[in-house]
């Protein structure tokens, strides 16, 4: 583990106390600091006692007075103060196993780290946890934990996760529920494996455990599945069945608990060719990051932003998105044109030749497909708008390692990056750019 302090934030409690980069944090309030969870938990109090080791090996103690919950302002070599824990499963539906060869190494790393669940919202299977670590989650009141459930029948969960001990983590879920640890769940539906009565059983078990919410999402299948288990995609009929089952239990939960608890991802409605539910269905949009309510939220936000738009005299544009969202984004652009008839713009759903045509989400569109399908398009706008989820977080790089600048050069157009909410899309369309 790395508890060596690499920098101290200016003006922070730690800087005011004279803590310097290069010192090692050993203890807070007489508790050994193992990783970032210990650090976050034990420095919450308004008065904290620190034990530090200086570069020459000597140790010193000091007490810092600060606001309750205020961060000390210490930074470490890695965010976790430790290495992320790799996944020990061999899931039948694992997307990483379906990646093409020769991509950057980080895309092949599978994490399954409870700390990243709490800190970053990652979904984890809990199969990496030891009993001691599970107890630490309870003791430190680490919450919420986001859990990849997949199934609650022990043998089925072992099979789906490719882990002979996968059923043990079901005990952790129950222990967390009894201890009041908040949990959100995710079930990836693989037709013929964990749908139908198996899905019904999983939902009923999670109701008993007491999850805050659970998303039901369709399995994603790329064209790179040679040597992997045979899985079938979610069909129109199957999508309708899943929606009906989830809505049945959602209505029960709403009556009993005041929340639907279980929500289908937008992709199910697209596949079933059914209209999206109204905004009230999604409650607080608890599962937005899993694609639950993303389209409804975007549509409502865009139309709200459109009310404040004042002029359609902007450069022509092409909105590039995934095939799944294409008709919805096209509807929004049509609404914008109703208000501003002079607006010149189009929406293009990019066919995913890179991963396979069954992959339709915008977050998996590559630069190669983007360029190939737009470069010779006669109606290509003066600006090309893309959602930020096409790029690596915080970087101007696509999944296939092409940069924004390379794509701009290939298209001869400037890219406008829009966040994935409707307000940002509206702003990007009506933005006056030099």
Model feature map: region roles:
Residues 59, 66-209, 220-249:
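Conserved Radical SAM active-site core
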Residues 16-34:
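Conserved PDZ fold ligand-binding element
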Residues 2-10, 30-33:
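Short, structured beta-strand/loop micro-motifs enriched in basic residues and often containing a Trp
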Residues 14, 22-25, 50, 94:
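Terminal peptide-recognition signature
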Residues 157, 193, 210-237, 257-279, ...:
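Flexible glycine/acidic-rich beta-alpha junction loops that bind and position SAM and/or redox cofactors
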Residues 144-146, 182-184, 213-215, 261-263, ...:
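Structural preference for beta-strand elements that scaffold enzyme active sites
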């Amino acid at each position: 583990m790395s508890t060596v302090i690499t920098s101290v934030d200016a003006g922070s409690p730690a800087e005011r106390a004279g803590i310097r980069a290069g010192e090692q944090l050993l203890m807070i309030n007489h508790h050994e600091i193992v990783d970032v969870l210990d650090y976050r938990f034990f420095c919450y109090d308004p008065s904290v006692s620190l034990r530090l080791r200086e570069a020459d090996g000597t140790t010193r103690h000091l007490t810092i007075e600060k606001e309750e919950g205020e961060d000390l302002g210490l930074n470490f070599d890695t965010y976790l103060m430790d290495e992320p824990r790799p996944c020990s499963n061999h899931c039948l539906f694992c997307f990483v196993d379906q990646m093409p060869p020769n991509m950057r190494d980080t895309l092949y790393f599978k994490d399954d780290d409870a700390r990243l669940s709490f800190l970053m919202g990652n979904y984890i299977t809990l199969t990496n946890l030891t009993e001691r670590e599970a107890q630490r989650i309870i003791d430190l009141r680490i919450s919420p934990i986001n859990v990849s459930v997949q199934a609650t029948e022990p043998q089925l969960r072992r099979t789906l996760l490719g882990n002979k001990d996968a059923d043990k983590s079901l005990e952790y879920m129950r222990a967390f529920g009894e201890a009041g640890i908040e949990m959100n769940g995710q079930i990836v539906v693989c037709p013929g494996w964990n749908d139908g009565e198996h899905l019904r059983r999983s939902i009923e078990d999670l109701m008993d455990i007491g999850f805050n919410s659970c998303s039901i999402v369709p399995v994603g299948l790329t064209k790179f599945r040679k040597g992997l288990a045979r899985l079938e995609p979610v069909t129109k009929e199957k999508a309708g069945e899943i929606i009906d089952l989830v809505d049945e239990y959602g209505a029960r939960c709403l009556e009993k608990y005041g929340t639907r608890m279980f929500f289908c991802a937008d992709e199910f409605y697209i596949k079933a060719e059914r209209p999206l539910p109204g905004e009230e269905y999604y409650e607080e949009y608890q599962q937005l990051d899993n694609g639950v309510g993303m389209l409804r939220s975007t549509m409502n936000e865009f139309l709200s932003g459109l009310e404040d738009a004042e002029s359609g005299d902007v450069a022509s544009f092409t909105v590039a998105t995934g095939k799944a969202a294409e008709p919805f984004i096209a509807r929004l652009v049509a609404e914008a044109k109703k208000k501003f008839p002079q607006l010149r713009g189009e929406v293009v759903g990019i066919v995913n030749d890179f991963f396979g045509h069954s992959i339709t989400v915008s977050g998996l569109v590559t630069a190669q497909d983007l360029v190939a399908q737009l470069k010779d398009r006669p109606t290509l706008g003066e600006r090309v708008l893309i959602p930020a989820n096409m790029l690596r977080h915080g970087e101007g790089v696509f999944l296939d390692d092409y940069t924004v600048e390379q794509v701009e050069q290939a298209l001869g157009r400037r890219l406008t990056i829009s966040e994935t909410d409707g307000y940002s899309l509206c702003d990007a369309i009506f933005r006056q750019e030099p």
